[in-house]
């Protein structure tokens, strides 16, 4: 669990080779923003949405993060290098910044609760 930290920002997304598409989800203590684009089709995102985050949602996200576990993960795949897809998660605040990149759809046991929340948010914004 992360202690309530208003400077914390969680970013996640996916990117696929051959201009197939990419998205990003940016979560802070006040806002959730989602952008999805298919670079091969247009420079204009197909989806660009944002909404305020509730205190309950923010607390659920904070409770889903074991920061020590996340900081110890060392995933750095490059499926996009061979026209595949990679998923990424970055966590940053005033004191730390760490990012991992892994094969799209892979569940990592130590961060599965966070991955589940990010997946739910992504589904919400894509519909």
Segments and roles (model prediction):
Residues 18-28:
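Short, solvent-exposed loop/hinge segments that bridge or flank secondary-structure elements
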Residues 1-17, 51, 59-62, 68-127:
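Short, well-ordered, aromatic-rich surface patches in folded extracellular/luminal domains
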Residues 32-33, 70:
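Primarily extracytoplasmic ectodomains and periplasmic/lumenal surface modules that are beta-strand-rich
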Residues 21-23, 47-49, 85:
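Residues that flank catalytic or metal-binding motifs in active/ligand-binding sites
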Residues 16-19, 41:
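Short glycine/serine/proline-enriched coil/turn segments at secondary-structure junctions
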Residues 34-48, 98-100:
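Acidic/histidine-rich, surface-exposed loop or edge segments in extracytoplasmic proteins
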Residues 26-32, 94:
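Short, solvent-exposed coil/turn segments at beta-strand boundaries
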């Amino acid at each position: 669990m992360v202690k309530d930290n208003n400077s914390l920002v969680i970013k996640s997304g996916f990117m696929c080779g051959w201009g197939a598409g990419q998205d990003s989800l940016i979560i802070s203590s006040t806002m959730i923003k989602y952008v999805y684009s298919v670079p091969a089709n247009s420079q204009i995102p197909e989806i660009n949405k944002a909404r305020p985050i509730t205190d309950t949602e923010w607390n659920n996200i904070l409770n889903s993060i074991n920061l020590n576990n996340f900081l110890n993960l060392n995933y750095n795949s490059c499926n996009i290098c061979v026209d595949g897809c990679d998923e990424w998660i970055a966590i940053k605040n005033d004191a730390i910044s760490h990012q991992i990149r892994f094969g799209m759809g892979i569940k990592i046991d130590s961060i599965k609760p966070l991955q589940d929340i990010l997946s739910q948010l992504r589904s919400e914004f894509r519909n």
